[in-house]
Curated annotation (Swiss-Prot):
It comes from Aspergillus niger (strain ATCC MYA-4892 / CBS 513.88 / FGSC A1513). Residues 718-739 form a propeptide. Its EC number is 3.2.1.6. GO terms for molecular function: endo-1,3(4)-beta-glucanase activity. InterPro entries: ConA-like_dom_sf (IPR013320), GH16 (IPR000757), Glycosyl_Hydrlase_16 (IPR050546). The keyword Membrane applies. This is Probable endo-1,3(4)-beta-glucanase An02g00850. Glycans are attached at N59, N74, N396, N459, N482, N526, N537, N569, N581, N592, N620.
Length: 739
């Protein structure tokens, strides 16, 4: 290679390493909610109020029919309370609405444009806040909150243990520095500026709140209607131009450790632990000098018209995260000399929601870690120095199985990790579960109870099928179809849930030789794939697609180490689609022509029984063969297809919930420490739906606890960096010299 060409290649490589970080760190819009979106992207909570409020939360159909919620003619979303009915102080509380997003979101930039929020009215306690699945461990962020006649917003953080923040440059006033529960339930508090909430906010035409969440800090800005930055109105927010935040939460506390993926919640309650507790000292009418709470309830019950202004009117909410689109785009345009992309999806023991994309100038390695709880994570990219040797471990140092493959870089990288508590996790990172199809014979896919060590072989065969049926628990099941034409070996997942009760087969095997179109099928009940990868090397017009190279956002359950390989193929395609629960599944199709190889299933029902370990299938040296690792999957390729399963969105221990859109109930709750009376309310409502409990008390804090929420997506973003390692440069130099 001429010296000039070599220097050009090295120079381009070095330049790309400097350009990529800037491109990758920009915020990309990942979610917009406005108008009708609040009726589909949020669930209506109908349980007892865990803060002991004098309130009755309406379900969606009732709320829509009575006008408690509606989409206005100008496209804004209205969410109000009953302001016409006089009530008995001994009866049910005033009707209101509480909604929570059916997805969870990690770090990013969150912008809400409000036309109106509940006014400064005695007895009210409105809030826009978020909570993690496990309160207080995963944290709570109170973005907008106030009680009674408050006119200045309170921004509060809650989490577990100890979590200190210190005084930073901000326009608000830091009044409490300890966010952790060890010091009580007050949380760390910033008192906002006058007019940042309530009646003055509405009189000024509303405004915009922005929250920036990173590993190191949480910042909050409030912009009155006439002072909204142009970058926000243009849809390209520039936090560097936002100015001094109203609240800046940063200190010795590790934000990354104490605040995990959050669900966003709107509600308006009445009285309750905070508003009722301070009612008599808030300048509100007192009817019972012996009880602030009773005075609050009496006022709320007897003065419905006072609450005509107690409504939310939302223009939009936009969520931005870093790196996903920008990283892939920059990689394609600036790293022209990069010949491959390494995609590594690792199955990690439960305990992490994070997804990290590891990028180098010559090789892009995407490492995704899958939470054993139910969550789908869309990653931003946090990148480090190059290495094709990858491994993952959870916070406790638990090791994770890792599968690294290389594919030609022809696609956008959008890593997703997901897991499901509804389905048993699979072990065996080296095991393979695949289907090699294009057969003339049809594979049988019945699904009995448990099969151990089942195998099926179809060698040098024509039109013969051998089937091994394995739903509930299938260990070491394998299927091989070698040297055959149009051979098929498959591991299907949860085929419409046909699972007889207890049929146990150990060491069953079937062989069919000298047949064409041979098939061997092993069908586990509920297959969940985490970490699917695909390879297509040395091929013409080859592609590794969808959930392997661009992992589809709304894969229900968990993907662990599944891989598909298509080597030396013409027009080879490899597809890793992921369904319910498969660990270490792999498929190989070598030296084939027109060979699709895929891991994953795009349709089926998520029936969720057991687990599959070490199932494998191989189809080698065949023409027109395909290999698949199929599992059970509902609603693939759509973020919103996974039903929301957060039954109670924060403010602990609701006893029941009713989801208009969720078919699978769950238990997520949050609270400000319910009293024994609240516990009684919760018990009384226990027959209405799923429940969860938590505790929290004091002037602020909602909290969430006992969250098992199956199949609830989690979207994560992160900072994007790229370091050009010396080894990468040397590798390129060596390659160039050899060439």
């Amino acid at each position: 290679m001429p010296t000039s060409t070599l220097l050009w290649s090295v120079g381009s490589l070095a330049l790309s390493s400097m350009v990529l970080p800037a491109a990758a760190s920009s915020y990309e819009l990942v979610e917009t909610w406005k108008g009708e979106d609040f009726l589909t992207a949020f669930d209506f909570y109908t349980g007892a109020d865990p803060t002991n409020g004098f309130v009755t939360y309406a379900n969606q159909s009732y709320a829509e029919s009575t006008g408690l919620v509606k989409v206005n003619s100008n496209g804004t979303f209205y969410m109000g309370v009953d302001h016409t009915t006089k009530l008995s102080t001994n009866g049910p509380g005033r009707e209101s609405v509480r909604i929570g997003s059916n997805k969870y979101y990690d770090e990013g930039l969150f912008i809400i444009d409000l036309q109106h929020m509940p006014g400064s009215v005695c007895g009210t306690w409105p809030a826009f806040w978020s909570t993690g699945k496990n309160w207080p461990t995963d944290g709570e962020i109170d973005i907008i909150e106030g009680v009674n006649k408050n006119e200045a917003n309170e921004i509060v953080l809650h989490t577990s243990g100890t979590c200190q923040v210190s005084s930073q440059k901000m326009s608000g006033t830091l009044t409490s520095t300890e966010c952790g529960e060890d010091a009580g339930t007050t949380g760390c508090v910033v008192e906002g500026t006058q007019g940042s909430s309530g009646t003055p906010f509405n009189e000024n035409g509303g405004g915009v709140y922005a929250m920036q969440w990173t590993d190191e800090f949480l910042k909050f800005w409030f912009f009155p209607r006439g002072s909204i930055p142009s970058s926000i109105t243009k849809g390209d927010p520039d936090v560097a131009a936002f100015g001094t935040p109203m609240a800046h939460m940063e200190g010795s506390c590790s934000i990354a450790e104490h605040f995990k993926a959050q669900q966003f919640i709107f509600d308006t309650t009445f009285c309750g632990d905070w508003a009722g507790g301070v009612y008599s000292t808030s300048g509100c009418p007192v009817s019972d000098s012996s009880s602030s709470f009773k005075s609050c309830v009496a006022y709320v019950a007897e003065n419905p018209t006072a609450f005509a202004e107690s409504y939310w009117e939302i223009n939009y909410i936009k969520i931005y995260q870093t790196g996903v689109a920008a990283s892939a785009s920059a990689s394609a345009s600036h790293v022209e000399s990069a010949a491959s992309v390494a995609e590594t999806i690792s199955a990690v023991r439960e305990g992490t929601n994070s997804v990290v994309a590891t990028t180098t100038a010559a090789t892009i390695a995407v490492t995704s870690t899958a939470d054993a709880e139910t969550a789908t994570t869309m990653a931003g990219a946090t990148t480090v120095a190059a290495s094709t040797e990858t491994s993952a471990a959870d916070e406790n140092g638990s090791s994770a199985s890792t599968s690294t493959h290389y594919v030609t870089m022809t696609t956008t990288i959008c890593p997703i990790a997901e897991s499901s508590s509804a389905a048993a996790a699979l072990a065996g990172g080296s095991s393979e579960a695949t289907e090699a199809s294009n057969s003339e014979g049809s594979p049988a896919a019945a699904t009995p109870s448990s099969v151990t060590g089942a195998s099926a072989e179809a060698n040098e065969s024509e039109s013969t099928s051998a089937a091994v049926t394995t739903p509930s628990t299938s260990t070491g099941a394998s299927a091989e179809a070698n040297g055959s034409e149009s051979s098929s070996a498959s591991e299907a997942g949860s085929v419409a849930g046909a699972t007889p009760s207890s049929v146990s087969t150990t060491g069953a095997s079937g062989e069919a030789d000298s047949s064409e179109g041979a098939s061997a099928a092993a069908t586990p009940s509920n297959v969940s794939s985490t970490g699917a990868s695909a390879e297509a090397n040395g091929s013409e017009d080859s592609s590794a697609s969808s959930e392997a190279k661009t992992v589809a956002p709304s894969i229900p359950s968990s993907v662990t180490g599944a891989s598909a390989e298509a080597n030396g193929n013409d027009s080879a395609s490899s597809n890793a689609a992921t369904a319910s629960n498969v660990s270490g599944a792999s498929a190989q199709a070598g030296d084939n022509e027109s060979t699709p190889a895929s891991a994953g299933a795009n349709a089926g029902s998520s029936a969720a029984p057991s687990s599959v370990s070490g199932a494998s299938a191989e189809a080698n040296g065949s023409e027109g063969s395909s290999s698949h690792s199929s599992g059970s999957q509902a609603g693939a390729h759509s973020y919103g297809s996974v039903p929301s399963s957060a039954a109670a969105y924060g403010r602990p221990a609701p006893s029941s919930s009713s989801h208009a859109f969720a078919t699978a109930p769950s238990s997520t709750g949050s609270s400000r420490v319910p009293t024994s009376a609240a516990a009684a309310n919760n018990a009384a409502a226990a027959t209405q739906g799923s429940s969860a409990s938590g505790s929290n008390s004091g002037s602020s804090g909602h909290g969430s606890s006992s969250a098992t929420t199956p199949s609830t997506p989690v979207f994560t973003g992160g900072a994007n960096k790229l370091t050009l390692g010396a080894s990468s440069v040397l590798s390129v130099l060596a390659f160039a010299l050899l060439a």
